[in-house]
Amino acid sequence: MTSSINILLLLHPTVVTDAHSVEQIKSKIYQSHNNDINSININQQIIDRITKGVIELPNDYYDEIIYINPNDEPQYREIPISLMQLIYKLLKSNGKFKGDLPLDQNLDVLMTGFIIEEEEQEQQEQQSGLNEGTVYVWVKPIPVDEPVVTLLKKKTTNNTKKSLPLFKKLNKNDMTINVPQEIDNITNNKRKLVETKLTYFSSDDENSSDGSLSDNANEEEEDDDELIDENDLLKYNNHNNNNNNNGEQSFSDKLITPRKCELSLNGGKKRKKACKDCTCGLKELEELEVSNQQNLQDQILGKLAQSATLEAIKIEERLKQQSQKKIKFTEEDLSEIDFTVQGKTGGCGSCALGDAFRCDGCPYLGLPPFKPGEVVKLDGFGEDI
């Protein structure tokens, strides 16, 4: 019996108003899973209720979470980081979060713990019901169990004193030495050593009287003949390949090819890493996987930089538009105000209180305080002209 697939369908509040579109989305989800209604459990929720904590859902429960958002503008598809973390907890290991996802939050997605992968267009259209191009799918990675190394406790003895080394006692028979016999043995050994030195450095190693080389020289030549040049091997290999039609065995048949690395026998869940001097091609496969992952991350970072530059250009255009706007004053703003009339005040409203309360450009600077409505004469302008 196949295990059931748990799917969480997150809907934007604007989608809930159209019941026909919701049923159409559900039917497409069933079609993508071969219309096996009994093995699929779809839980339909509004995304606002989950973000506010009104509804609590079980963690590590859902195989897929599909988000439906009819808004096409990217600013209305933004998902907060708290909601990303909640979705990460709700998904099972290797679970997928797909649908109408934002395209400018890839850095937040990676920081949350997801892996961004591409999904084919046809499968994505069947599950989401949207006619868009190839999109990215957020995948919750499978946790890797780290091996636990148990350390053995060192045995401690209560005896702090160290035992002394034991020496074997010699017998009395071993202590007696036959002195003349030992002296004869020493002299014989010295004689043998001298004879070997003389034979090694004798004149036989040099050229003989006939002009022929000695036996040692001939042995050295034979050793040199045993060395094989790499180019000669290649020529010999080509020659044997040409003679294969005559039934002769080629030199390449004698070569030993290394055995290809196989998967581990413990369930086949994880393959072994390539050896240090790998020759079966497993190391190249691992390097290809790393390069593909690096290219994907570079594409994501490139799109992030592109979106940042576009946002900066928009901000500059907004500032230019604000700077081009000119402030226009009305006739009431430009009308003159008589500061001496009661009920009329200036910009600061404190001209009559004295210099301590007047502005820098006030014409009453230097004059004593006066009451509103009192006639004030300004003299001394002729001296400044």
UniProtKB/Swiss-Prot annotation:
Keywords linked to the UniProt accession: 2Fe-2S, 4Fe-4S, Cytoplasm, Iron, Iron-sulfur, Metal-binding, Mitochondrion
Motif (Cx2C motif 1): 348-351
Record-listed [4Fe-4S] cluster binding positions: C348, C351, C359, C362
Domain of life: Eukaryota
Region called N-terminal SAM-like domain, residue ranges: 1-177
Molecular function per GO: 2 iron, 2 sulfur cluster binding; 4 iron, 4 sulfur cluster binding; electron transfer activity; metal ion binding
Protein's UniProt name: Fe-S cluster assembly protein DRE2
Name of the gene this protein is made from: DRE2
